[in-house]
Amino acid sequence: MAVHQEKLYPNCDSGVWLRSCEEEVTEPLEGTITGEIPSWLQGSLLRNGPGSLKVGSMRFEHLFDSSALLHRFAINDGSVTYQCRFLQSNTFKKNRAAERIVVTEFGTRAVPDPCHTIFDRVAALFKPGESLSDNAMISLYPFGDEIYAFTEGPVIHRIDPETLDTLERRNLMDSVSLVNHTSHPHVMPNGDVYNLGMSIVQGRLKHVIVKFPYTEKGDMFAKAHIVANMSPRWPLHPAYMHTFGITENYFVIVEQPLSVSLLTMVKSQPSNEPLASSLHWYPNHETHIVLLSRRDGKEVKRYRTEPLFYLHIINAYEHDGVLVVDLCAYKDAKAIDAMYINAIETMQSNADYAEWFRGRPKRLELPLNATNCSRIEPRLLAQLGCETPRIHYDLYNGRPYRYFYAISSDVDAANPGTIIKVDTKTGETKTWCDTNCYPSEPIFVPAPGATEEDDGVILSALVWGGAGAHCRRVALLVLEARGLRELARATFCAPSPVPKCLHGWFLPRRTQL
């Protein structure tokens, strides 16, 4: 007789991350509306994230390896439609054609390709845009009137924001020789885009800031150029960074003690080892916060703080001689291990799993007149696990702000599927949740003519725990941003399971193609 094992986290259904979409939704589905969508809310919420863990009889080993699935919620005069399509990356097409995993991913080793010799694999080190996976399953960002899907490799993909077709593949090695970049560039009010990456500058590997100048006509990528650079703290172990900050006068680089070992990468290339094997956490080394001048691109000052791991910076700004950096911080990098598929499947029997994801929003206050390498102690902003944070981006990115919105990262919470609003001034928090419901990154959309920072709505994609019809259910949630009161939702029944998504972008109707 089978012994029933008690779940350590009975309120958390990890299955929402383990689903694989089996059928795309190319023709828009009409949603069932409850409540009332504000009449001014018109446009599309575009989402990106893991879509399928399966290729033939094989399975990916890490969540970041899952085939990219694009989602669209189109809002039009109070009604909403839903679509989803797989990103047609080279990696996706090669895997589907072979019916097996033939391109090594972040955490998954591909099957050997008999056509590739050891010399081919060594040569691949010098052309990462073509040899590495281009499975851009993390985020979506606008470059002018075009939308691109991002991962951390140098290849991005332009998508059609209405059909979700994959239109174009761009290798940034061709324009600014980026060997990698973050999944979260900054889009400025004038349309310029900045991103942090790595490039060879005067024969040395550097962390660089690249500017893509906005142009109404022409190619933003053709005019891309490096505007700032800094040497890694450890030349052969550059820090892994998923985001960066930008303020009025500075680019803000948080150099955490999680590094990518270049030597391990070189050694592992012939054996086809995944990138994750090159990541190393150094618990006895501090985190450095580096300020690069937006005027001349040079390093101005650096600060030290406790060892911490982060994926997302919430915001950064200057005020009264202090530069403030808010971020979602963890004590170590176990959160990456927690996203291995085996770890997700066995979490209910892993007493340490909740601690792996025990992140908290913290604030670093950097006096601009401090001596170089001053030590800064972080300050807790809220006693809640917060991830995929968003702010009123258009008006408050890089400027003094008060509110941010996030989803819970506490798997042992009473309801892990919670949307959180944090008041950084008072420490007050507001939450929204529903039974067995798992929201995605909450995106703030300002109301027309808004004068208050939180005058607008929050949009979030919802999925539900469970099997059968539950795993095919997906919805768009609309919350009033001030109090997180539910205004409306549009619910759909997809033809196959809908996995939980990661990041996205809202396109108001006026900016759509």
From Swiss-Prot:
Fe cation binds at H184, H242, H312, H503. It is an enzyme of class 1 (oxidoreductase). Its cofactor is Fe(2+). Binds 1 Fe(2+) ion per subunit. The keyword Endoplasmic reticulum does not apply. Signal peptide: none annotated. Its EC number is 1.13.11.65. One of its GO terms (biological process) is carotene catabolic process. GO terms for molecular function: beta-carotene 15,15'-dioxygenase activity; carotenoid isomerooxygenase activity; metal ion binding; monooxygenase activity. It catalyses: all-trans-zeaxanthin + O2 = (3R)-11-cis-3-hydroxyretinal + (3R)-all-trans-3-hydroxyretinal. InterPro entries: Carotenoid_Oase (IPR004294), cNMP-bd_dom (IPR000595). Pathway: Cofactor metabolism; retinol metabolism. Keywords: Iron, Metal-binding, Monooxygenase, Oxidoreductase. Pfam families: RPE65. Belongs to the carotenoid oxygenase family. Catalyzes the oxidative cleavage at the 15,15'-double bond of carotenoids and the simultaneous all-trans to 11-cis isomerization of one cleavage product. Carotenoids like 11-cis retinal can promote visual pigment biogenesis in the dark. Essential for the biosynthesis of the 3-hydroxyretinal chromophore of rhodopsin from zeaxanthin and for proper photoreceptor development. This is Carotenoid isomerooxygenase. It comes from Galleria mellonella. The gene is ninaB.
